[in-house]
């Protein structure tokens, strides 16, 4: 049985205490953050963390992010905290930024995929912070979806994947950003962007200078993943996804051509983007990159529910949040990309 705790209208501490009790007991709780919903367990309880991997069907070498509510918790989890980490934490925490640091001995290796590094962030969401505070434990939490599927931006999405399989879902409404956190590896110099996300790379570079972009961001395969989203296919709906990149007018013409082609083949076609199309299903993502990021996973899940055979997606410019949007679209498509 799964308990759904509704705090959409008002955050009541006694309700969050119920969920915190589940965390202390080694059980799983799905909760909202500013990015996507997380599937949380006590980060210091190895058996509880293993349940996350089992519930999601997640490969054991795909690390988890630990969520904290205070800098003091970071000092427990990380063996070393470089000056750059302190600068970034001071500027961007709470917020959608994950830092990869040398792990301390208290962090179970099941969380880190067997590596000597740990990924940590402080979420900018009142419910998430209150849950961590009341459970009195750091919380390990990947996105609250079956591995490989689009990430959840609402409690409804979580319930689609996990109702009856986990102990508790906290319903705090839709998430504000819609894509996962940005992950920066501070164990190398210059620092490395392992995953683009809700905090644009340009903002981080203003604080600590140049950051290298890991080749995995653009699809290069890796043997070892220091962060989630690097090694395996992610964010994918059931339908085939094709991303069309290029100038907006050319993208539109190409998508219209593809709609006609697939309809001739008897396929049901969906389109996600900012234009209107004569497709079977069209999901309008918005006009700004912030709106597109917020609605992307919702759109992919919507297309799954409508039963389309093919999803055609408009590419966006890779600036600001656009880098994260394109990273997610490319992975969702399995790198089926048409450039025009």
Swiss-Prot record:
Positions of L-threonine binding: 35, 67, 121, 141, 181
Catalytic reactions of this protein: L-threonine + hydrogencarbonate + ATP = L-threonylcarbamoyladenylate + diphosphate + H2O
Predominant localisation class: cytoplasm
Residues annotated for ATP binding in this entry: 58, 62, 117, 143, 151, 195, 235
EC number in record: 2.7.7.87
PROSITE patterns: YRDC (PS51163)
A biological-process GO annotation: tRNA threonylcarbamoyladenosine modification
Cited InterPro entries: DHBP_synth_RibB-like_a/b_dom (IPR017945), Sua5-like_dom (IPR006070), Sua5/YwlC_C (IPR038385), Sua5_C (IPR005145), T(6)A37_SUA5 (IPR010923), TC-AMP_synthase_SUA5 (IPR050156)
Compartmental location: Cytoplasm
Keyword DNA-binding: no
Superkingdom, taxonomy of origin: Archaea
Keyword match Nucleotide-binding: yes
Record keywords, A-Z: ATP-binding, Cytoplasm, Nucleotide-binding, Nucleotidyltransferase, Transferase, tRNA processing
Pfam families linked to this entry: Sua5_C, Sua5_yciO_yrdC
Gene Ontology MF terms: ATP binding; double-stranded RNA binding; L-threonylcarbamoyladenylate synthase
Residue ranges annotated for the YrdC-like domain, each copy included: 13-199
Coiled-coil stretches noted in the UniProt entry, renumbered to this chain: none
GO cellular component entries: cytoplasm
Family, per entry: Belongs to the SUA5 family.
Function according to Swiss-Prot or TrEMBL: Required for the formation of a threonylcarbamoyl group on adenosine at position 37 (t(6)A37) in tRNAs that read codons beginning with adenine. Likely catalyzes the conversion of L-threonine, HCO(3)(-)/CO(2) and ATP to give threonylcarbamoyl-AMP (TC-AMP) as the acyladenylate intermediate, with the release of diphosphate. Does not bind tRNA.
Protein name as it appears in the record: Threonylcarbamoyl-AMP synthase
Species name: Pyrococcus abyssi (strain GE5 / Orsay)
């Amino acid at each position: 049985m799964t308990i759904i705790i509704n705090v959409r209208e008002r955050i009541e501490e006694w309700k969050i205490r119920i969920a915190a009790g589940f965390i202390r007991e080694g059980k799983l709780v799905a909760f909202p953050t500013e990015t996507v919903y997380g599937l949380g367990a006590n980060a210091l309880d190895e058996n509880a963390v293993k349940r996350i991997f089992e519930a999601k069907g997640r490969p054991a070498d795909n690390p988890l992010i630990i969520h904290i509510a205070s800098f003091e918790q970071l000092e427990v989890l990380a063996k070393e905290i470089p000056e750059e980490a302190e600068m970034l934490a001071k500027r961007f925490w709470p917020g959608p930024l994950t830092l990869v640091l040398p792990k301390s001995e208290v962090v179970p290796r099941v969380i880190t995929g067997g590596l000597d590094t740990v990924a940590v962030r402080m979420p900018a969401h009142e419910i998430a912070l209150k849950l961590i505070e009341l459970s009195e434990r750091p919380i390990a939490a990947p996105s609250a979806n079956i591995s490989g599927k689009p990430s959840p931006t609402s409690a409804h999405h979580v319930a689609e994947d996990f109702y009856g399989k986990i102990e508790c879902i906290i319903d705090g409404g839709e998430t504000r950003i819609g894509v996962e956190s940005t992950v920066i590896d501070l164990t190398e110099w210059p620092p490395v962007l392992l995953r683009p996300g809700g905090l644009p790379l340009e903002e981080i570079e203003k604080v600590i200078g140049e950051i290298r972009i890991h080749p995995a961001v653009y699809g290069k395969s890796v043997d070892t993943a220091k962060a989630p989203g690097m090694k395996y296919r992610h964010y994918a709906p059931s339908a085939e996804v094709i991303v069309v990149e290029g100038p907006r007018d050319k993208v539109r013409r190409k998508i219209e051509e593809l709609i006609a082609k697939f309809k001739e083949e008897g396929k049901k076609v969906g389109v996600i983007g900012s234009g209107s199309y004569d497709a079977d299903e069209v999901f309008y993502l918005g006009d700004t990159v912030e709106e597109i990021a917020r609605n992307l996973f919702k759109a992919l899940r919507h297309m799954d529910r409508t039963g389309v055979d093919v999803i055609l997606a408009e590419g966006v410019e890779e600036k600001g949040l656009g880098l994260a949007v394109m990273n997610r679209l490319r992975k969702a498509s399995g790198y089926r990309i048409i450039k025009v």
